[in-house]
Amino acid sequence: MDLARQLKNAISSGNLLFGQRQTMSACNSSDARMVIIAANCPTDYIEDLRSRHPDVPMHQVALVNRELGAACGKPFPVSAIAIVDGG
């Protein structure tokens, strides 16, 4: 199963948060089970997120933020996704 299909399944059946601020907030409150990061997400954000939350699994995908947003069915770019409940 490809990433786009998995994301659409998670969106329809689970709880995902989109964007850098919401992802950081979910990690700060220990709600995030996993984080998906776009290929062109700023390096300083990724390093900050990894240093503050080393216990949260993070996966950087090959898709840039516009492609990641489209894969999620969103009309806007998405650079970070926090999976709170995968469904």
Feature-to-residue mapping (PLM):
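Charged, alpha-helix-enriched surfaces in structured cytosolic catalytic cores
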Residues: 2, 44, 63-66
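Fold-independent oxyanion-binding glycine-rich loops
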Residues: 20-21, 39-40, 81-86
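N-terminal positively charged helical leader segments and presequences
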Residues: 22-59
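C-terminal structural segments of small proteins and small subunits
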Residues: 55-87
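Absolute protein N-terminus
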Residues: 1-2, 87
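N-terminal first-folded block
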Residues: 2-34
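Surface-exposed beta-strand edges and their flanking turn/coil or helix-capping segments
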Residues: 6, 31-33, 50, 73, ...
